[in-house]
Amino acid sequence: MQLYTYLYLLVPLVTFHLILSTGTLAHGGTLTERRSTDTTALKPEPVLLQKSDARSTDDNDKDRLTQMKRILKKRGNKARGEEEHSKYQECLREIRVNKVQQEC
């Protein structure tokens, strides 16, 4: 009976000691920093793009950044041009009128 009591207490201690000393679990997964060094070794190095490759172009092979700068300069650095802004305001008015008519 005493032998079973000692084994009952000894087996968990031995397995816990083995897990901590080897740093591995039953399936071979690591508990220590080995896993983190492996993942950093697998990370790809960043690709350095040239300035021309980094910029996107549209269907006509024109630089989108340059086109956007021209558009903003033409609009006076506003988010929308005057025409787009007036169309947006008209749509808002129509929506408000429709809501008022639906409530009545």
UniProtKB/Swiss-Prot annotation:
Residues with the 4-carboxyglutamate modification: 83-84, 90, 94, 103
InterPro entries to which the protein is assigned, alphabetical: Conantokin_CS
Positions contributing to a divalent metal cation binding: 90, 94
Cellular compartment(s): Secreted
GO MF entry, a single one: ion channel regulator activity
TM helices/strands, residue ranges: none
Disordered as annotated region, ranges: 29-87
Record field: compositional bias (Basic and acidic residues): 52-66
Cysteine disulfide links: 91-104
GO CC field: extracellular region; host cell postsynaptic membrane
Signal peptide range: 1-26
Pfam families (UniProt xref): Toxin_36
Keyword Signal on entry: yes
UniProt keywords, alphabetically: Calcium, Disulfide bond, Gamma-carboxyglutamic acid, Ion channel impairing toxin, Ionotropic glutamate receptor inhibitor, Magnesium, Metal-binding, Neurotoxin, Postsynaptic neurotoxin, Secreted, Signal, Toxin
Tissue specificity as recorded in UniProt: Expressed by the venom duct.
Family: Belongs to the conotoxin B superfamily.
Additional free-text comment from the UniProt record: Adopts an alpha-helical conformation in presence and in absence of divalent cations. Calcium facilitates disulfide bond formation of the synthetic peptide.
Domain notes from UniProt: The cysteine framework is C-C.
Task performed by this protein: Conantokins inhibit N-methyl-D-aspartate (NMDA) receptors. This toxin has the highest potency for the NR2B/GRIN2B subunit, followed by NR2A/GRIN2A, NR2C/GRIN2C, and NR2D/GRIN2D subunits.
Protein name: Conantokin-P
Species of origin: Conus purpurascens (Purple cone)
